[in-house]
Amino acid sequence: MAEDIIPNFDRISAEDQRVLEKAVYHHSDYRLPDTLTEREKTFCKIIREADQLDIFRTIVESGWETIYGCGREEILASEISDAIAEAFFRRQLADYAKRSTPADYHLAHIALCFGLESKAARKRALEQGYLQQMMELTFLRPEVQEKYIRLKTEAENYLTEEEKTEGAGGADS
């Protein structure tokens, strides 16, 4: 696998090869395994953050219809489930298995911001502007919009805080 991507991969030490392979293999796991070493977790987090930033770009550039199979109007007419809202209030990644409405699918992607643990990644997300574009939402029902504003505020506060506490981003921090 890696030898196809990284030239001279065979010249990297066996330990470094193992770390890189684990990082690539686990970077998209909802929760990182407890069995990873600190070094392996660090590499996973680097790849995860790059991937999350790319997901924001892909959603904006590809459009909602392509990504979600429904249009903006359908998403903005739907509800926000308590399970997805709770992820925002806990400042954690949303469990994709708990998405139940069109809005949940979009908000679960916005919640990826809680996986941006490094200041550099949060700064880059703000500089790129894709996440802010994803968060420009006005839900059709006032009670849903009110709930969304609280979620959006939580995400914006997270992105602009200087220091992250241990455990931010979920159980895999």
Describe each PLM feature range.
Residues N8-H26, R39-I46:
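Acidic/histidine metal-binding catalytic segments
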